[in-house]
Amino acid sequence: MSKHAVVQFGVVYALLFPGVFGFVPSPTNVSVVCHNFVNVLYWNYSNPTEQTKFAIKVEPYESPSQTVDTSQTYLDISSYSTDVEDDYLVLLTAHDGQEKSEDVSIRFTYSKDYFDENKHKYKCSLDFPAVNTSVHKDVIEVSFQHPFKLYKQEIMKEEFTYKITHDEQMVKYSCFEDEDLCNAEVHFNQSVAGQCVELKLEGVIAGIPSYTYSNVCVPQPTPETDKTGIIAALIGGATVVLFIIMGFVWLLWRKWSNIPQMPQGLWCIISKQSHTMLLSQPEPTDICPVTSQGPLNYLTEEDQSVSARDDTGADPPVVSEEGMAGEDSQGLGCSSDYDRPKFL
């Protein structure tokens, strides 16, 4: 066998059995996805063996390095890159037994102070905060939380600058972490009424970019209601209610006016009797006096004269027997006790 053939056979055999000659290929297509502070390293590797493992070394610029091994072709290195203000260099090496490949490196950072387009192949990013929209006439109102309230990272305690693009027109805005909400107004043409429009929102905070899209449907404007009819209806209703109240009052007045009045003569008798009873009654006591229901007894003129004499203390006149007899004869002719004199 010629020398040239032996060399060719050795190269082929070394490629097929790299562990025999100490040749271990390096990982390829190494990339890192750093988004929302979740950092995952990916790579490819051809013809791995049962003994193939990968060593990942994370070297922060401002803190000590850490190394971890895995047999997978990806690794979440978020727990090894928690400081979002630092710059990270990642070294990846393949191991097959005692042999190892050459290192493959990649850099990433969230910090604008460390980012260098020549050194950092990938630029870390964040999701734009959830956007709320509402339409009022010819304005779309946009609101969302400041990124610091969403991610709670000290690096984000600063101004958040963002821009909104609509219909090829871009407007810049800004807000700070102490504001409850970031608010913006986007004016649109009434010609888009009844259609949906797309808003593109792009923001940057601490040098970290974020963006999102929002579709907003603009409703058709509703015609203004003619208030003349409403006012007329209210006035008409009030008039009807007023007439009902007036009719009710009129019915009550008619009812009260039909109550019969007390005759004038009866009213005079009741008034006189009440006055007489008030004069003749003694001082009021707790026991109510009982009034007689019989006919009233009236004193004659003679009885009144006798009573008057008794009051003055004068002696009564002497009456003869003839006079007494005459009076008795006259008294026998009366059938009523009302004419008979009363003697006490």
From Swiss-Prot:
Residues 300-344 are annotated as: Disordered. Induction: Up-regulated in response to ifng1 (interferon gamma 1) and tnfb (TNF-alpha 2). Gene3D superfamilies: Immunoglobulins. Residues 24-102 form the Fibronectin type-III domain. It is found in: Cell membrane. Residues 251-344 are cytoplasmic. It is a single-pass type I membrane protein. Keywords: Cell membrane, Glycoprotein, Membrane, Receptor, Signal, Transmembrane, Transmembrane helix. The chain crosses the membrane at residues 230-250. Residues 1-22 form the signal peptide. Glycans are attached at N29, N44, N132, N189. Highly expressed in brain. Also detected in spleen, heart, intestine, gill and kidney. In immune cell populations, detected at low levels in monocytes, peripheral blood leukocytes, splenocytes, neutrophils and mature macrophages. It comes from the Eukaryota. Residues 23-229 are extracellular. One of its GO terms (cellular component) is plasma membrane. Receptor which shows binding specificity for the cytokine ifng1 (interferon gamma 1). This is Interferon gamma receptor 1-like. It comes from Carassius auratus. The gene is ifngr1l.
